[in-house]
A protein has these predicted regions:
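N-terminal helical cap/lid subdomain that shapes the substrate entry/recognition surface
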Residues: 2-97, 104-106
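Conserved phosphate-coupling serine/threonine residues in phosphotransfer and NTP-handling enzymes
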Residues: 12, 114-116
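Residue-level marker of regulatory loop/turn positions in helix-turn-helix DNA-binding domains and
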Residues: 92, 113, 145
Length: 223
């Protein structure tokens, strides 16, 4: 029986793509790095920030961003993101509020594991009025083996004393699916975020949904 759901936030619950891309492009410009397209930047969403920039400028690129410079990019990104992040900038995806409420009423433990900071997750959960339903939050600084590693899932399982077969991960990118599978947990991929159906299929995702409301059907399949 399903006991616990671990949700990604960006691209799964909150529609943050535009502010993320704006912040990444502004960071690239401020740091004097070669241009990258929005598509290239979007492909990094879901990774820890430093890794986003080291992956955008790898060893074979015209400009290399190592770990040290990647950390500087990450700090610049956070500052710019905070500047751009005005109230109402990040909406929930369709059917998230009522579906989250319905899942909570079923007695399922609802949690979030994200590559963004714990502080910003707390703020979004509060501002988007999800605090009544979300029982546990993990940001990138809360775990050692961050997404796509299994760290966030394993820590959540330990917190709630659950087995892998009692939990699912819900996310919009291959990194979410890899995190789930690396921890021995099944995954739900959403197609409306930053990833694609093809990406989910390539990761052998157990369920692929086009609308958050379909989470009710996924959960019912466990009963």
């Amino acid at each position: 029986m399903l006991k616990t759901i671990i949700f990604d936030f960006d691209g799964t619950i909150g529609n943050t793509q535009q502010i993320i891309l704006r912040s990444m492009q502004a960071t690239i410009k401020e740091m004097g790095l070669p241009e990258r397209t929005d598509c290239q930047c979007a492909a990094m969403i879901g990774l820890p920030l430093t890794q986003c920039f080291t992956n955008l400028y790898p060893d074979y690129s015209e400009t290399i961003v190592d770990e040290e410079k990647g950390a500087l990019c990450a700090a610049t990104y956070r500052r710019l993101f905070d500047e751009f992040n005005e109230p109402g900038t990040v909406p929930l995806f369709p059917h998230v509020p009522e579906t989250i409420k319905a899942l909570h009423q079923k007695g399922i433990e609802l949690t979030i594991a994200s590559s963004r900071s714990h502080q910003t997750l707390d703020a979004y959960v509060r501002d988007l009025q999800l605090g009544e339903y979300i029982q546990y939050i993990l940001g990138v600084e809360d775990v050692k083996d961050a997404k796509p590693g299994p760290g966030p899932v394993l820590k959540t399982l330990k917190e709630f004393r659950r087995l892998p077969e009692e939990c699912i991960v819900v996310g919009d990118t291959k990194y979410d699916i890899q995190m789930a599978h690396n921890a021995g947990v099944k995954a739900v991929g959403v197609t409306y975020g930053n990833g694609s159906r093809k990406e989910m299929e390539e990761e052998n995702t157990e369920w692929i949904i086009d609308d958050f409301a379909e989470m009710i059907d996924v959960c019912n399949s466990f009963l």
